[in-house]
Amino acid sequence: MSRRWKAIGAFAIAGVVAAIAVTAAAAHSSSKHSTTFSGTLNIMGFGTNGDDVAKNRFAIAQKAVAPAKVNAPNGGFNEQQFLTDIASKQVPDLVYWDRSYVGTYAAKGALMPLDSCIKSDKIDTSQYRQAALQSVTYNGHIYGIPEFFDVRTLIVDTHVADTSGVTGKMLNTANPTVLKQAALKMYQHSGSQVTRIGFDPKLPEFFPLWAKAFGANILSKDGLHPDLNSPQAIAALTYANSLIQAQGGYNAFLAFRNTWDFFGSDNQVAKNQVGAWPMEEWYYNVLASSSPNVNVTAIPFRSKTGDPINYSTGSAWSIPKGAKNAAAACQWMKTMTNASTWETVANIRKAAYAKAGQYWTGLFTANSKADAAINKPTSGEPKKWASIINTVEAAEKYSFALPASPASAQFNTAWTNAVNRVLQGQQSPTQALNQAQKEAVAAIKQATKK
């Protein structure tokens, strides 16, 4: 299961959730179907350990495919095992994985296109966010049903910003010059040691976000033509890297960042060790549970044109070619990702949070209908958390994703390694991205070789 829910912990609310959820599966009636399922549904990559959202959705989906049995060993997707399964023609019926895998395995012919599944089970694809669907669509066919939906906004420590004379208007990624000034106002050091990061651009992970903000599309819509060394992409990397170099340089910057108690009560916001940085939405849950009284807010990430943007990633369900129980797999995917299932488990969690005195900070999925219903501030919730939910929910509407590609892994490796070479001073942004472009072109050419 996604780290977002493991991160916020099963801690004190675990017992409450269990008590509330006892009748959840029995009460849920939205997944009625006419097909009678049988045999065993074998799933790879989905676990429920310590995760109430996963457990409750699992129970609902399990009921939907009954009397078929469900075999889902805890643990994430194992690519080496999956390759072995494909070679031996003993594939699981369903895989749960990062959406970046979908294009690669669809191109290999290892996945079933879901056209007939979507039609026979009447799966409403309009409920899923377009950015999520784009990342599971290859050569005109859908090969995955999207699940979670990462939303990246700027997390701002308002205490650090206020005491440094930095306003929200200055923390505007649409204005690189002013943003850098704000970063340096919040940055602190003692000699060569960094003691506070003013602004962390989150490299290499968020390079696609910076590239998009500067006007670059680093991969074509069909996933076949990389454009990693465009002037816009080079400018984006040059700027984002300059933020780190201006704050002590990469080694000192990274050394300090590695000291953060990221998931604990002494996290970098609670200890005022960072001014602002782009981050996925699940981290607000971490803050709300570990340090609910921190001074924090959310600001949209904006392109140089001033428009809000979000680089979305997330998980998906896919059916391998040769699956023996594809009918049950299709029903499982539909049930796990439909709006009524999300609403049921969200309400269970909300009730548990309320009983435990914890603040609700949202559950963000690839299902826009579900999110509209569940991501509303609860009564009595502090304004800062309510504001954060609203900001994240709004950001979902401005999302883009990297298209499905036959060489997604190699493409991601190419740009990640390029950014790392720049951070470590081994190459200039132009040199690094020129090399990455050659590597990506070669990888896609090899992957599409007949």
Language model segments and positions:
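Conserved N-terminal structural module of periplasmic/extracytoplasmic solute-binding proteins
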Residues: 2-104, 119-126, 305, 340-344, ...
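A local structural motif
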Residues: 64-74, 90-91, 165-171, 221-225, ...
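Short helix-initiation/N-cap motifs at beta->coil->alpha
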Residues: 73-82, 100, 174-178, 254-267, ...
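Short helices/loops that flank or line small-molecule/ion binding pockets
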Residues: 80-91, 108, 160-161, 180-189, ...
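Hinge/lid segment of periplasmic solute-binding proteins
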Residues: 100-152, 178-182, 297-299, 382-383
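Helix-loop-helix "hinge/cap" segment bordering the ligand-binding cleft or interdomain interface
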Residues: 118-119, 137-206, 216-254, 321-327, ...
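Extracytoplasmic/periplasmic substrate-binding proteins
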Residues: 206-209, 214, 237-335
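C-terminal lobe and pocket-closing loops
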Residues: 283-293, 306-312, 318-413
